[in-house]
């Protein structure tokens, strides 16, 4: 949204000091910039050089039925950065990710609840009610719920690992379209956004996010996912897109 560019690391690396994750294993360090050039400058200053990236996979919209008027320019940007179409790989990922939006709140919420536990009740009034409710739900997850979510997480991770043996990166939409109004920011919209973005978080993948201009002048978003920091070819894709 808002035409900004972004980069997020994998959760096992923290080059910027004095920052700690509120949801260990899911929150990551990252930064935003107003252009691809700015993101290149900041990322070079923090990370140094990057490994090269070859061709990636354009994985479509995971079967979420994104409006073709939105999906077409997202696909065009994916192809511009070097992604190719591979229907079999895209279908493998779609099938593996069907329950990602369900598993992420369970695992991420439980991890976050452990961090917030010392002050969650004492400072309840300082939280947005919806946020507090999610953290409260996180600390009440049963062992059975956590095991079931872990099975889903493993399925998503395994699908990405299989795809990364043939493709250097995976490109997916990051949004369903342009930013919606506050009134439309309901749980249904949140769940659809999670369906697009939870797979990368569950698999712990570093990513680049880029804005995609739509015909009405607004922007949607695209995410470019890499297997790990050792193969995080952020420079290659940003240079193709700038």
Where are the language model's segments positioned?
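Gly/Ser-rich, acidic/histidine-flanked active-site/gating loops
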Residues: 44-109, 139-140, 213
């Amino acid at each position: 949204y808002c035409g900004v560019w972004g980069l997020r690391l994998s959760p096992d690396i923290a080059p910027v000091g004095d920052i700690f994750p509120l949801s260990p294993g899911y929150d990551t360090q990252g930064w935003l910039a107003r252009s691809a050039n700015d993101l290149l400058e900041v990322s070079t200053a923090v990370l140094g050089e990057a490994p090269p990236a070859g061709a990636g996979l354009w994985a479509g919209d995971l079967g979420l039925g994104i409006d073709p008027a939105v999906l077409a320019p997202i696909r065009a940007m994916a192809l511009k950065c070097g992604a190719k179409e591979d229907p079999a790989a895209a279908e493998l990922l779609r099938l593996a990710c069907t329950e990602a939006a369900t598993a992420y709140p369970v695992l991420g919420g439980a991890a976050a609840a452990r961090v917030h536990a010392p002050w969650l009740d004492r400072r309840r009034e300082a939280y947005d009610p919806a946020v507090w409710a999610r953290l409260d739900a996180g600390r009440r997850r049963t062992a059975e719920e956590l095991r079931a979510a872990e099975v889903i997480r493993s399925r998503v991770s395994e699908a990405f690992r299989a795809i990364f043996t043939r493709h250097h990166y995976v490109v997916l939409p990051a949004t369903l379209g342009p930013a919606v109004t506050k009134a439309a920011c309901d749980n249904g919209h949140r769940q659809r956004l999670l369906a697009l973005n939870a797979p990368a978080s569950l698999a712990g993948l570093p990513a680049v996010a880029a804005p995609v201009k739509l015909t009405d002048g607004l922007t949607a978003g695209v995410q470019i996912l890499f297997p790990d920091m050792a193969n995080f070819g952020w420079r290659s894709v940003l240079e193709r897109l700038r």
